[in-house]
Amino acid sequence: GPGAGFVTENIVNKAKKVYAVEIDEDAIEALQHIKTDKFKLIHNDILKTQLKELEDTTFKVIANIPYYITSPILAHLLGEIDDLNNDNRNRITEIVLMVQWEVAQRLVADENAPSKQYGLLSILTQFNADVELIQKVGRKSFYPAPKVDSALVKITINNEPRVKVDDYSYLRRVVKACFATRRKNLKNSLMNAGFNKNAVVQTLQ
């Protein structure tokens, strides 16, 4: 959300059009001073906002998001939820986010990273996009200072996924099962998630 509008005003000065999605009533009131046709304020929950309802064009998303809903927001923007009406991923070219430092490490992690960093969030984000860690931002950069460090990350959406998949929700289910119980072997993890034993064994052989 645009909050009090400090960053938003600078973006408005440089962009052709800015759509700001804000759910907080007080913030909505504080943003009334931005008066230009280039700025449109949307009073809504970002998790319930479909970009196709705003304008038939592509978007760049810039946000300093609440850290506790980072994963749901990314899932919504990248179309990772099982929702046939969610075409947000097709309308976004780039996402720039301020996130918790540990989340940033997970977003950019590859198979060579420590096991705690590489997982569901890493794979499903990088399946759709290239992720770049722009800068680590220390907690003392904010007032009041939070208890965690932050980082600025840039997510560039690819025109096509890295691998062609017919059923994205099935892929998500498989990846989630693989990382749900990291200390178990892969066969047991998939079987515990409800996958057919014979199919799992045959696939892994």
Outline where the language-model segments fall:
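Catalytic cores of RNA-modifying enzymes
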Residues: 1-168, 173, 205
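C-terminal lobe and adjacent flexible extensions of AdoMet/dcAdoMet transferase-like proteins
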Residues: 157, 175-205
